[in-house]
Amino acid sequence: GDEVHVLVAGENCAAVANEVATAAGVSKVFCADNAAYGHFLAENISALVAELGKDYSHVVAPATTTGKNFMPRVAALLDVAQVSDIIAVESSDTFRRPIYAGNAIATVKSDDGIKVITVRATAFDAVAAEGGSASVENIDAVHNSSKVRFVGEELAKSERPDLTAARVVISGGRGMQNGDNFKLLDGIADQLGAAIGASRAAVDAGFVPNDMQVGQTGKIVAPELYI
């Protein structure tokens, strides 16, 4: 098949690029190590990806919060339509993706010369972390938009797995009645090694913060077990 090239962008990310180079199936790694990419501001990352992506047939990123932020901008810069959140590849131009909050699966075909795609990572098996020996090429191009600047971030720490990658998810809704009752799920989740999610109703009621919301207006999950 065609070669797979991977872009690693960030600040002080050279070690990550070297680690990615050992992944099976990777032919080349581009390393864009610059403070401009340190906080993944969409304006900066999208310009970088579009500049590199114009020479490729497919530009792919995970359908994470970050990917959903910058990839539509990449598609706009390349003047193509994005194919979002795919769960299967039928051919080089045809893909399957969920629609209507996962109640139906659409098969979509892209006629664009460059396919800009976001992938639901939990729908695909991970490649082996070792077995490859890709070359690493440093990217000197710096895209640093004057229209945005990083102000700060608030990181929520948790020993539980991330919702979007968890194999087991236990979720609560309006029936939990209040935030104190919602905490009853903690013990079950700890026993199962599960992530905890919540419905929009529970979030709107103030039982839990909105980063726990799952579904069409929240985080997309694909666990092996959903309770």
Could you tell me what each predicted segment is?
Residues G1-Y226:
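N-terminal glycine-rich FAD/FM-binding segment characteristic of electron-transfer flavoproteins
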